From Swiss-Prot, chains A, B:
Highest taxon of the lineage: Bacteria
Function field: Might take part in the signal recognition particle (SRP) pathway. This is inferred from the conservation of its genetic proximity to ftsY/ffh. May be a regulatory protein.
Pfam family name, one: UPF0122
Gene3D superfamilies, alphabetized: Winged helix-like DNA-binding domain superfamily/Winged helix DNA-binding domain
Record HAMAP family: UPF0122
Coiled-coil stretches noted in the UniProt entry, renumbered to this chain: none
InterPro entries: RNA_pol_sigma_r3/r4-like, UPF0122, UPF0122_fam_protein, WH-like_DNA-bd_sf
Annotated family: Belongs to the UPF0122 family.
TM region(s), chain numbering: none
Descriptive protein name: UPF0122 protein CA_C1753
Length: 116, 116
C-alpha cells in the first residue's frame, strides 16, 4: 500500500489519540497534500516546527499500530467481509424460495453493519 | 456489566499500551483478585505505590476506551455476529441442497474468523 494512503488510514484510526492541532496538521500534509512551508504559513509557525510535529506524530501512529494492529485487523476483516458477501451472492443465485432470499439479504445487511 | 469484568476487558484490549509492570499489577488486581497489600508484597513496594499505579492505569484505560471505543465496538459486533449465526441456522434448517448447506457452513466459519 502506498505510504501516504497507509498514513491516512493510521490517522483515521488513531487520530483520536492525538491533539486536535496534531490531527489538523497531519491531515493537511497527508490528506490534502500541502507542503510543509504551506502548512507552516497556515499555522503561523516555522517549517521546522511543522517538520518536527509531523515526524513525531508519524512515529506515534506507527507505534499505536504496532501495539494495537487495528489497521492490520481492518484489512483482514475487509477481506473476510468480501469473501462472505461473495458466498452470499452465490447462495442467493442458487436459491428460489422467497423467504430464504430475504433472510440472505438480512444477513448481508448485518455483515455491512459490522464496525471493523 | 460488572466493573471488574469491564476493567478486565479494557485491560485485554489496551494492555499493549501499558508497560509490562503496569499490566502485571492490573492483572493481579482485576483478574486474580489479589488485594493491594498482597500485590505490594509481591512487587516489593508499598501499598500506596500499588494504589497509585492502579488508579493511574484505570484512568488511562478509560481514556483509551473513551477515545477508541474498541470494547463498545466489540460488544456491538458480538451481538451482530450472534444475529448472523442465528439467521444462518434458520437458513440451514430450511435448505435441502447439500452444496448450499456446505456454503452456509463456510460462511459460518468466515464469521468466526472475524477479529473484532
Amino acid at each position: 500500500m502506498e505510504e501516504r494512503i497507509y498514513l491516512s488510514m493510521l490517522l483515521s484510526t488513531y487520530g483520536s489519540l492525538l491533539t486536535e492541532k496534531q490531527v489538523n496538521v497531519m491531515r493537511l500534509y497527508y490528506d490534502d497534500d500541502l507542503s510543509m512551508p504551506e502548512i507552516a504559513e497556515l499555522n503561523n509557525t516555522t517549517r521546522q516546527a511543522i517538520h518536527d510535529l509531523i515526524k513525531r506524530c508519524h512515529k506515534m501512529l506507527l507505534n499505536y499500530e504496532n501495539k494495537l494492529k487495528l489497521v492490520e485487523k481492518y484489512k483482514r476483516n475487509e477481506d473476510i467481509k468480501k469473501d462472505i458477501k461473495d458466498k452470499l451472492y452465490i447462495l442467493k443465485d442458487k436459491i428460489q424460495d422467497k423467504d430464504n432470499v430475504q433472510l440472505i439479504d438480512e444477513i448481508e445487511k448485518d455483515i455491512n453493519s459490522f464496525s471493523i
